[in-house]
Amino acid sequence: MNLLIMGLPGAGKGTQAAKIVEEFGVIHISTGDMFRAAMANQTEMGLLAKSYIDKGDLVPDEVTNGIVKERLSQDDIKEKGFLLDGYPRTIDQAHALDATLADLGLKLNGVVNIDVDPNSLVERLSGRIIHKKTGETFHKIFNPPAGDYDENDYYQREDDKPETVKRRLDVNIAQGQPIIDHYRKSGIVHDIQGNQEISEVFVDIKKVIESLA
């Protein structure tokens, strides 16, 4: 079973990816892990990626695509299947993935798209506050400080401010939507309602994956 999981930041993609791996035994392939492994193992593409990262440059698509191809060509993938997480990030990378899978004789069976209203994500992602003295982290809605607290005792990181979060989500939507549209043409996208309990989201995902087996 070869799968791709997609969803906006805060949609619970990481949580659900871990559950899928545990339940179905597929290999979890996240971009960060892939890069770290390729660099640690000093593969051709890993060394190339390191040369860009060490200079503080962005790693070009062709190197990222090469690292993905190196990983997908390993034996455990053919045995167990994979769950791609965090790649492809752009439509160009999606086309490169299509070519890679064709070269390796692999097929993408399904795209799990966790669909969450972006406005609710702004609320979810911009609620984090940090106590100025202790550095303790809280969430205005999901994990507020005890009792009546004084907002002046807390601060927000720039990354967590609503306008920054909204910009980040807008970028993700602009990049992600063409990828979803691309795979929708093949009829392999399965939209999962993400505005429900974690366990309920996974029940829906499990049904989809079992239907593909």
UniProtKB/Swiss-Prot annotation:
Instruction: List GO molecular-function terms, semicolon-separated.
Output: adenylate kinase activity; ATP binding
Q: Does the keyword Secreted apply?
A: no
According to UniProt, this protein's pathway is: Purine metabolism; AMP biosynthesis via salvage pathway; AMP from ADP: step 1/1
**What PROSITE patterns does the entry give?**
ADENYLATE_KINASE
Catalytic EC class: transferase
Carries keyword Kinase? yes
The residues that hold AMP are: 31, 36, 57-59, 86-89, 93, 157, 168
Gene Ontology BP terms = AMP salvage
What stretches pass through the bilayer? none
The entry sums up its family as follows:
Belongs to the adenylate kinase family.
UniProt comment concerning the protein's domains: Consists of three domains, a large central CORE domain and two small peripheral domains, NMPbind and LID, which undergo movements during catalysis. The LID domain closes over the site of phosphoryl transfer upon ATP binding. Assembling and dissambling the active center during each catalytic cycle provides an effective means to prevent ATP hydrolysis.
Name of this protein: Adenylate kinase
Native organism is Streptococcus uberis (strain ATCC BAA-854 / 0140J)
Gene name for this UniProt entry: adk
